[in-house]
A protein has these predicted regions:
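Short helix-loop capping/hinge segments that flank enzyme active sites or metal/cofactor-binding pockets
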Residues: 1, 160-171, 218-273, 285, ...
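Short, surface-exposed loop/helix-turn segments at secondary-structure junctions
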Residues: 1-4, 44, 147, 260, ...
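Gly/Ser-rich catalytic/binding loops embedded in alpha/beta enzyme cores
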Residues: 1-82, 192, 270, 274-275
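Acyltransferase
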Residues: 11-19, 155, 181-205, 229-234, ...
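Conserved hydrophobic/aromatic pocket- or pore-lining residues that grip, position, or stack substrates
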Residues: 18, 46, 130, 194, ...
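A short helix-breaking turn/cap at a secondary-structure junction
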Residues: 99-185, 189, 364-392
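Short, well-ordered beta-strand elements
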Residues: 122, 339-348, 355-356
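Small-aliphatic-rich amphipathic alpha-helix that forms the alpha element of a beta-alpha
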Residues: 271-274, 305-330
Length: 392
């Protein structure tokens, strides 16, 4: 509601980069308020349904982008990612989302400039398409303290990589995330179809540690406090429950809490990076649940156990964020309910090019198997028409 009637006078720098590269900007798509949460609904535009079942969520926060891609409304789309904001909707809608290293795509509007966890990235219907958009998005911008010349090292085109030379770690839950039992089963089945193509595939969790949830809660609260404290004081009636929750959590923390979380986050990152002394990438589910009804803000329980807060079901995503890593979410068939299922291919910070190459090659391998190929929504059914029409 805060920006219900707002029309920006200028483009965001990333949009300006896309235009400068020859991109044609079509529209804006729906998100949850200020990108808070994994369900794209808000009090201005309502909820965006999933193209495979409009009664269910498309994910969030970049849910509208994922739907536009899945239904053919747009060939490319931008997304953002803090707790999985482009990876979750990519998984829920059967498209590709890429979380790049901090600073690769400049972000200049953060209230707290020295926070690297929220990034901007590309989304597409294939890894190649996402890479194409990344080339347009990525650039140096002196207003982003994490920006540098890494963009210059991105390949102009993806050539792929021999998966038989790649070592992978496979983790169903990152060693810390609640994951629905049916999603675990689907993940195990899908991994069984492709683990043999790699040079080495070991079942191994990254060492993210038991404090990761508290670390995330504190640092996310800090981020929301820097952006929304004044709004919470002046116009609390215009803020939804998710933004209010994290801003209030930020107010409850002390400087000592924030200092502790900063130190622990550094330890998490270093332990995670050590994994890549022995493997090239980590493969995990891209979402912990099947898409749920968009009428509910978020899952409140999993496997019969209550979830602590509205973000806990996203730990499979924010665990990756807290490690400051690169991650590509790619489609991998459908789950037990016939909804899109995705996996994430993650690497260490700075490994954008190699993660894209591996994800591209794995995507091609998955496309050859009906059980793991990218699913397509029934557009005629969505439009109330007859037989489904194939979409490229």
């Amino acid at each position: 509601l805060v920006y219900a009637d707002d029309v920006p006078a200028t483009d965001d720098p990333v949009v300006a980069n896309i235009r400068a590269a020859g991109g044609i900007v079509l529209c804006k798509t729906n998100t949850p308020e200020f990108g808070a949460g994994g369900n794209s609904r808000n009090d201005v535009h309502g909820a965006t349904g999933n193209p495979f079942d409009p009664t269910k969520t498309c994910g969030g926060s970049s849910g509208g982008s994922a739907v536009a891609l899945a239904t053919g409304m747009a060939p490319l789309a931008t997304g953002s990612d803090y707790g999985g904001s482009l990876r979750t909707p990519s998984s829920f809608c059967g498209v590709v989302g890429f979380r790049p290293s901090p600073g690769l795509v400049p972000s200049v509007d953060k209230a707290a400039a020295l926070t690297p966890w929220g990034v901007i990235g590309p989304m597409g219907r294939s890894v190649e398409d996402a890479h194409l958009l990344l080339l347009a998005q990525a650039d140096y911008d002196k207003r982003d303290p994490f920006s540098g010349d890494d963009y210059a090292r991105l390949p102009e085109a993806l050539s792929g990589i021999d998966l038989a030379s790649v070592r992978v770690a496979i983790s169903a839950d990152l060693g810390c995330a609640p994951v629905d039992s049916n999603i675990r089963k689907t993940f195990a089945e899908r991994v069984g179809t492709f683990r043999g193509v790699f040079a080495e595939a070991q079942d191994r969790d990254p060492d993210l540690g038991p404090q990761i949830h508290d670390v995330f809660e504190i640092l996310r609260g800090l981020t929301f406090l820097t952006s929304h404290h004044d709004r919470l004081k002046k116009t609390p009636d215009k803020l939804g429950p998710n933004v209010t929750y994290h801003t209030q959590r930020g107010l409850e923390r002390s400087a000592a809490d924030v200092a502790w979380a900063q130190v622990e986050q550094g330890k998490i990152m270093k332990r995670y990076m050590a994994l890549f002394d022995e493997v090239d990438v980590l493969i995990a589910p891209a979402a912990s649940v099947s898409p749920f009804p968009h009428s509910q803000w978020h899952p409140t329980e999993m496997n019969g156990e209550k979830l602590d807060n509205y973000m806990r079901w996203l730990a499979i995503s924010y665990g990756i964020t807290m490690a400051l890593t690169v991650s590509a979410s790619i489609p991998c068939g459908v789950d037990h309910l016939g909804m899109p299922f995705g996996i994430q291919v993650a690497g260490p910070n700075g490994s954008d090019a190699i993660v894209l190459e591996i994800a591209h090659s794995l995507e091609r391998h998955l496309a050859a198997n009906k059980a793991t190929a990218r699913p397509l929504p029934n557009l005629n059914k969505l439009a109330g028409k007859g037989k489904p029409k194939a979409m490229a």
